[in-house]
UniProtKB/Swiss-Prot annotation:
The keyword Chaperone does not apply. Component of the TFIID complex. TFIID is composed of TATA binding protein (TBP) and a number of TBP-associated factors (TAFs) whose MWs range from 14-217 kDa. Interacts with TAF12, TAF12B and TAF13. One of its GO terms (biological process) is RNA polymerase II preinitiation complex assembly. It comes from Arabidopsis thaliana (Mouse-ear cress). Belongs to the TAF11 family. GO terms for molecular function: protein heterodimerization activity. Keywords: Activator, Nucleus, Transcription, Transcription regulation. It comes from the Eukaryota. TAFs are components of the transcription factor IID (TFIID) complex that is essential for mediating regulation of RNA polymerase transcription. The keyword ATP-binding does not apply. Residues 1-98 are annotated as: Disordered. This is Transcription initiation factor TFIID subunit 11.
Length: 210
């Protein structure tokens, strides 16, 4: 004798027979979920394989270079500002306006030849580079604290010495009846004469090698 099924139980059994079992997410079977899972895994692997360690040092190096250039630029600007301030301070001092000195200067200039006047004008326009003089003073004194007044004085003294060296070399060339540019032999003779006249400072420290 057959028992009749409950209508509710019969409906549940029919639904279970019609719907297939759900596949696990990210499983091996072919479906939308499995393809999305493989795509995510591949993207993760690609991101892990990127040469991150290679790019980061380059960015760091670029940053260090930019910082170094900025520091050097600030240092140059500070040096230029210091030079400008020193020039402004020097202009505050009154210039020599003694009539006797001015008349003497005019008398000397009137006796210059055309070649001498050209050299004198070049001498007045010329100037030694202050950064190079600063490096020289640092090497001589061994101190990094070199003030701008000291650099200006050293440049002025060196400029006067070079001018006397050139003029004495021209006198040597005139005595030898030679023309053209100044040669090393003329500079050596000029230096020897200036040394005999006491215009070359003596060494305070003896030479180690002769």
């Amino acid at each position: 004798m057959k028992h009749s099924k409950d209508p509710f139980e019969a409906a549940i059994e029919e639904e279970q027979e019609e719907s297939p079992p759900e596949s696990p997410v990210g499983g091996g079977g072919g479906g939308d979920g499995s393809e999305d899972g493989r795509i995510e895994i591949d993207q993760t692997q690609d991101e892990d394989e990127r040469p991150v360690d290679v790019r980061r040092p380059m960015k760091k190096a670029k940053t260090s270079v930019v910082v170094t250039e900025a520091k050097n630029k600030d240092k140059d600007e500070d040096d230029e500002e210091e030079e400008e301030n020193m020039d402004v301070e020097l202009t505050k001092y009154p210039t020599s306006s003694d009539p006797a000195k001015m008349a003497k200067m005019q008398t000397i200039l009137s006796q210059f030849t055309e070649d001498q006047m050209s050299r004198y004008e070049s001498f007045r326009r010329s100037a030694l580079q202050r950064p190079q003089m600063k490096k020289l003073l640092i090497g001589v004194t061994g101190s990094q604290k070199i003030g701008m007044p000291m650099i200006i004085v050293a440049c002025g003294i060196a400029k006067m010495f070079v001018g006397e060296l050139v003029e004495t070399a021209r006198v040597v060339m005139a005595e030898r009846k030679e023309s053209g540019p100044i040669r090393p032999c003329h500079i050596r003779e000029s230096y020897r004469r200036l040394k005999l006249e006491g215009k070359v400072p003596k060494r305070s420290v003896p030479r180690l090698f002769r």
